[in-house]
Amino acid sequence: MDKIIKSIAQSGAFRAYVLDSTETVALAQEKHNTLSSSTVALGRTLIANQILAANQKGDSKITVKVIGDSSFGHIISVADTKGHVKGYIQNTGVDIKKTATGEVLVGPFMGNGHFVTIIDYGTGNPYTSTTPLITGEIGEDFAYYLTESEQTPSAIGLNVLLDENDKVKVAGGFMVQVLPGASEEEIARYEKRLQEMPAISHLLASKNHVEALLEAIYGDEPYKRLSEEPLSFQCDCSRERFEAALMTLPKADLQAMIDEDKGAEIVCQFCGTKYQFNESDLEALINDKA
């Protein structure tokens, strides 16, 4: 089962989140039938949103949009504070071969664009923030958002490793943030440790990558585990929700679906589930609108 572990240095100088998101990203790949580069780009976005959602309280809903002008198009993810996330990528078929070290390229195929976050607190006034894409690698763009919009300097590592068949082998990441009150000495020590950390891909390849991430982040520094919470890919779409959407259409449009298509098929963008509405279903909707 996927999970996020929240921890804090015993000194109170900084905190860290580490994630195992392997099942989340594997299910996203299965549902959207994404090829290699598209899988990694979507996976990193899902992991970023899992981190962002874990930082919120209450019943907030968090939307992350990575909007680029190159091959991937837009990547959209929605998460809640209960560990659920869903998402999709416009172009599922980007399949750029790995580098000599086995890395899948993402940044060059994201292009120029924006990292957009929308946090809905359920009060009717969602908070929206837009920052430019810095590298298109998702992790660096997420870190820049946290620094610029939330005024919280953060170190971020996100990645998805694929097997020889381009299926998800492991996915996960981390976030480290300096906390108010940290001394200059503590900040310097934290920065030095992060600079000396192995690459995220190397840590994810470890037998127990969650523990490897924690060890790399804290080293010999004592820390406390605050919580361990489950994560999953879960879509909240339903037939009732799409039926309500059909009800917003004019009668003429519903009648056209009956006359021309003998019904309607609606496919959820986030999970690919198909909902069928036959002629009788559409006629009932027309009658309900009368």
Curated annotation (Swiss-Prot):
Under oxidizing conditions two disulfide bonds are formed involving the reactive cysteines. Under reducing conditions zinc is bound to the reactive cysteines and the protein is inactive. This is 33 kDa chaperonin. GO terms for molecular function: protein folding chaperone; unfolded protein binding. Belongs to the HSP33 family. Disulfide bonds join C235-C237, C268-C271. Keywords: Chaperone, Cytoplasm, Disulfide bond, Redox-active center, Zinc. One of its GO terms (biological process) is protein refolding. It comes from Streptococcus pyogenes serotype M3 (strain ATCC BAA-595 / MGAS315).
